[in-house]
């Protein structure tokens, strides 16, 4: 059983209830809905090293989320749903295929945006 599979099994069984950091980095093709079981406690979510190209529209259900890493995935644009996560301070989408960063994807409280090794030609004027 892979580490990610074991972590998902532990998440499904409730063994991870109350954790503040979750690392799921091992070839996931879609966002595991089980993550929402941690909605009231999760602060750091690492989904790097997967095959993701989108995040769920209801990501803001993770009300305490401060940091999200989605490096080395298949994103072509920074997901606009990130702006609905009001506690989000750090976003890392290194080594994807991001070409576009829409102003609507930038959360007002965002302090760090990591887009190294992408294909972004311009950033929104709202980023200073």
Residue ranges and their predicted role:
Residues 1-117, 121-125:
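The feature captures the LRR N-terminal capping module
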């Amino acid at each position: 059983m892979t580490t990610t599979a074991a972590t998902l099994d532990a998440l499904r069984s409730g063994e991870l209830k109350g954790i503040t950091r979750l690392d799921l980095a091992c070839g996931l093709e879609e966002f595991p809905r089980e993550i929402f079981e941690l909605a009231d406690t999760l602060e750091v979510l690492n989904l790097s090293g997967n095959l993701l190209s989108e995040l769920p529209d209801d990501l803001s259900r993770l009300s305490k989320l401060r940091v999200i890493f989605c490096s080395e995935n298949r994103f072509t644009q920074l997901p606009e749903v990130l702006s609905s996560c009001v506690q989000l301070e750090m976003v890392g989408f290194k080594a994807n295929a991001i070409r576009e960063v829409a102003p609507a994807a930038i959360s007002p409280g965002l302090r760090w945006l990591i887009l190294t090794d992408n294909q972004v030609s311009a950033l929104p004027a709202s980023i200073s």
